[in-house]
Amino acid sequence: MIMKTYFSGVSTLGVHSLATEDYGFFPLSVDQKTMERMKNVLDIPATQLNISNSSLIGSLCVGNSNGLLVPDITTEKEVELIKMFLKENSLDVNLERLKAKNTAFGNLILTNNKGCIISEELSRFRKTIEDVLDVESGVGNYAELPTVGSNGVATDKGCLVHPLTDELELEWIQDILRVDYVERGTANRGVTSVGACILANIKGAVVGGDTSGPEILKIEEALDLID
């Protein structure tokens, strides 16, 4: 199932939220009706919060069913809220505050529960990232861009990436993430940073409200969401 929506008129949902196979984090500005619809589509428990006193949740943190990486500028109150949410939902998730010069972990890491791709900008933290997310990784860029997280969206079945990703890079991504499908595409009527526009897991996807019909078909194909 795929749902189209906006967050207070904004269609870059992936910048402001995070969804995994088992949990989700959304900005405080999202109304309760939209929250419930997204939770139903993705079939996950979710909560609303800030990261580092910011609504840029998806840009600043990255996670999968095994772990969650947040920047060290995340406040103690925010960390406690995350811990409480995980405990209330019986989720065994490694939570790590990582100190790095570039704190946009969501923009620089693309992960699912099988593997992760780490931007060269975070290569020195490879071991920590692998340990927290409990996956093997590959370090590198694709489409000549270091922002491997914001330019891709991955589930345990498939992955959609920037349209300029070449064939060798597609094979590399597929091998690391161990998915059946890797496709090139866009969202929100031509936006190439698909990770900034889409939230997805194997059960469903939430896409920016500007996403066209043909783009939705490509998203469904790449993420194996076609019934």
Swiss-Prot record:
Query: Which processes are annotated in GO (biological process)?
Result: cytosolic ribosome assembly
Record key words, sorted: Initiation factor, Protein biosynthesis
Q: Name one Pfam family in it.
A: eIF-6
Q: Which domain of life is it from?
A: Archaea
Give the GO molecular function terms: ribosome binding; translation initiation factor activity
For this chain, the family text in UniProt reads:
Belongs to the eIF-6 family.
Q: What does this protein do?
A: Binds to the 50S ribosomal subunit and prevents its association with the 30S ribosomal subunit to form the 70S initiation complex.
Q: What is this protein called?
A: Translation initiation factor 6
Q: What species is this protein from?
A: Methanococcus maripaludis (strain C5 / ATCC BAA-1333)
Lineage runs: Archaea, Methanobacteriati, Methanobacteriota, Methanomada group, Methanococci
